[in-house]
Design a protein with these regions (language model features):
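N-terminal loops that bind phosphate or other acidic moieties
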Residues: 1-83
Length: 83
């Protein structure tokens, strides 16, 4: 069984986004793994496995507009079900 159930992915569009600061925030304030934050000051892609995807969305929405949001249940996927 997966330790972290939800594969959470999204884009953040904003101004003066800081990839390193976003990465540091998740490492310090969120439980999860497979964290990926890539982009530039205008657009950041987030990928994170967590049990609390709503917290990821809430934080990212505080930074700018969020879109292309995907939250997949990896436990369901491992059972051959739609995530």
């Amino acid at each position: 069984m997966e330790e972290f159930r939800y594969d959470t992915q999204l884009l953040i569009e904003g101004a003066d986004l800081d990839e390193d600061a976003i990465n540091d925030y998740f490492r310090l304030h969120s439980k999860g793994d497979c964290l990926l934050t890539v982009g530039d000051e205008d657009l950041i892609k987030i990928h994170f496995h967590t049990n609390e995807p709503w917290k990821v969305l809430e934080y990212c929405a505080s930074l700018g507009e969020i879109y292309d949001i995907v939250v997949e249940d990896m436990v369901r996927q491992s059972k051959g079900l739609h995530g």
